[in-house]
Design a protein with these regions (language model features):
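Cytosolic-side transmembrane-helix boundaries in multi-pass membrane proteins
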Residues: 195-202, 207-209, 281-331
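Hydrophobic core segments of alpha-helical transmembrane domains in multi-pass membrane transport
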Residues: 23, 48-52, 113-117, 167-178, ...
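Membrane-interfacial amphipathic/re-entrant helices at transmembrane-helix boundaries
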Residues: 1-23, 36, 50, 59-74
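Helix-loop-helix "hairpin" substructures at the membrane interface of multi-pass membrane proteins
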Residues: 158-237, 261, 266
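Transmembrane helix-bundle core of multi-pass membrane transporters
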Residues: 112-182, 285-293, 319-331
């Protein structure tokens, strides 16, 4: 039914899953504070285009003589800045102004995609390109540089060493977020805010500070997912609306992993594999069948959500105050 070998399939699944890992880790941190940020797709989009803008103007200024360190750091810093601004905007609307989180998140996604398409289209016009895309192949080479031994250690190198550095950064961040949430006092305070902001406030925890920090840091992590997609997965090529539904997959991954960043590592690879499974179908397979296979991550997420709801185990539930604005005067 499928035509592929596992050694070549897994690296592709990993590369497809890394943006999801960045996005889900950032969203888990955000949701642990009680903020439901459905703007993650837009934030990832802004993170991607911000990195592209920084890289584009650096390549223009350097004139082809790129410094490896700057070629990496400028896009990363621009991506972090762009996604941070999106996170701050979301926090201002939902934490300070107490706007509805669901509506705000959806608006942020629409806004982020619009911003990305505007700047992406503007850069394409600057290049006078005949194709609707921006190619940053020179910068992409630095992001795609693999670990030593990737080409000389056979299947081991292909499975474990053949990825750009951001893939390993994503795994480290996920493990670090898991340790932070479960083994540190600030992590305990953050979870307390997400469970009951009024109780945390009564205990002397600064609810506003934790919500702002968790959401902004989570947004920056998610933004790196957009940068990875462009610079590594897409080989440095930006095309408007090329992200597809990866941002929504990252949100689905949060539910699938039951709000556990460490579980997201393997789950993102699973989702990545399911997402690209359709391309391994026989050539004659109908388009409708391929689209059904692309639905698998969402179907599995719904099944997990149903199972978790039926089990009713407290540790498997979302933060109790998720999506609820905190009104201190009602404490």
């Amino acid at each position: 039914m499928f035509d592929f070998d596992i050694v070549s399939f897994i690296p592709r699944a990993v590369m497809q899953g890394i943006p999801l890992l960045f996005g889900s880790t950032g969203e888990i941190l955000t949701e642990k504070s009680g903020n439901l940020n459905l703007g993650i797709p837009g934030i990832m989009y802004v993170g991607g285009i911000s990195g592209v803008i920084g890289s584009f103007f650096y390549e223009q200024a350097a004139g082809g003589q790129l410094n490896g360190f700057l070629a990496i750091m400028i896009p990363i810093l621009c991506s972090l800045l762009g996604s941070l601004l999106m996170g701050l905007l979301y926090c201002f609307l939902t934490v300070t102004l107490r706007a509805n989180q669901n509506v705000t998140g959806l608006a942020m996604t629409t806004f982020g995609v619009g911003v990305g398409n505007f700047f992406g289209g503007s850069l394409i016009k600057l290049t006078n390109s005949e194709v609707p895309s921006i190619a940053l192949a020179n910068t992409s080479l630095y992001f795609k540089t693999t670990l030593p031994g990737a080409d000389s250690t056979g299947w081991f190198g292909e499975l474990f060493l053949s990825y750009g550095f951001l893939a390993y950064v994503a795994i480290i961040i996920a493990l670090g977020a898991s340790y932070f949430l479960n083994h540190t006092r600030p992590g305990l305070h953050l979870r307390a805010v997400g469970e009951s902001a009024s109780t945390a406030d009564a205990a002397g925890i600064n609810v506003t500070k934790y919500k702002y920090l968790a959401t902004c840091i989570g947004s920056m992590i998610a933004g790196l997912g957009g940068l990875y997609y462009v610079m590594d997965y897409a080989n440095g090529v930006w095309s408007n609306n090329a992200f597809g539904d990866r941002g929504w997959l990252a949100i689905a991954l949060v539910i699938f992993t039951i709000w556990r960043p460490n579980v997201s590592i393997l789950a993102s690879i699973l989702f990545g594999g399911l997402y690209i499974l359709n391309i391994y179908l026989p050539t004659g397979a109908q388009m409708a069948v391929k689209e059904l296979y692309k639905m698998l991550p969402y179907v599995i997420t719904l099944i997990v959500l149903i199972i978790v709801s039926l089990r009713k185990k407290r540790e498997d539930q979302p933060p109790a105050s998720l999506g609820l604005s905190y009104f201190r005067e009602e404490r």
